[in-house]
Design a protein with these regions (language model features):
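Membrane-embedded transmembrane alpha-helical bundles that form the catalytic cores
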Residues: 1-184
Length: 185
């Protein structure tokens, strides 16, 4: 029954954080719902809702308007503004959903891991991926990258392993096969 509860744990199903059974098994057995935990959960949930509804949705609406401009109506500055707005919209969308899931979990006595750690202040691409959808990166590392040999293989296989994880991460985030093969949706 504990495993069934884990499988059906709705707060983290939609956008993460990805919680492994081993990490939540003890919490299922001995979780405690407290007023303080419920309050912290409400704070996380509200923060996530603000990120999603106020920031992500608004930025997305502005981006759609910029994207609808013709080449004559648009400039390089407008295109760059659109690109920045889109990256911020994606961040606020994903991290908002994650914060709402963390908050709901906390309200029910669970402690889910943080999923985003300010990725846009990263100092390198590697640092960015360590901060972006962290539980997904951990999952792909443990269940795909390491079983393929990780970086303890030849350079060619290491590159292959990185490309496989990169491609699967794209699929996870909604990129279809056409996008992966031809950069088209």
């Amino acid at each position: 029954i504990n495993f069934a509860l884990y499988i059906a744990m709705f707060p983290q199903l939609i956008a993460g954080p990805i919680v492994r059974y081993e990490d939540v098994e003890q919490q299922i057995r001995s979780r405690k719902v407290t007023i303080a935990g419920f309050g912290v959960g409400c704070e996380f949930f509200i923060r996530g809702m603000v990120k999603k509804v106020l920031f992500a949705n608004l930025l997305g609406q502005i981006f759609v308007r910029i994207q609808a401009l013709s080449n004559v109506q648009s400039s390089i500055v407008t295109a760059w503004i659109g690109a920045i707005l889109y990256t911020l919209q994606i961040y606020y969308d994903f991290s908002g959903y994650s914060d709402m899931a963390i908050g709901l979990g906390r309200m029910f006595g669970f402690r889910f891991p943080q999923n985003f750690n300010y990725p846009y202040i990263a100092e390198s691409i590697t640092d960015f991926w360590r901060r972006w959808h962290m539980t997904l990166g951990t999952w792909f590392g443990e269940y795909v990258y390491i079983p393929l040999g990780g970086n303890r293989v030849t350079t060619a296989k290491h590159i292959r392993n990185l490309l496989i994880v990169w491609g699967l991460t794209g699929v996870w985030h909604g990129a279809g096969i056409n996008f992966l093969l031809r950069s088209e949706e």
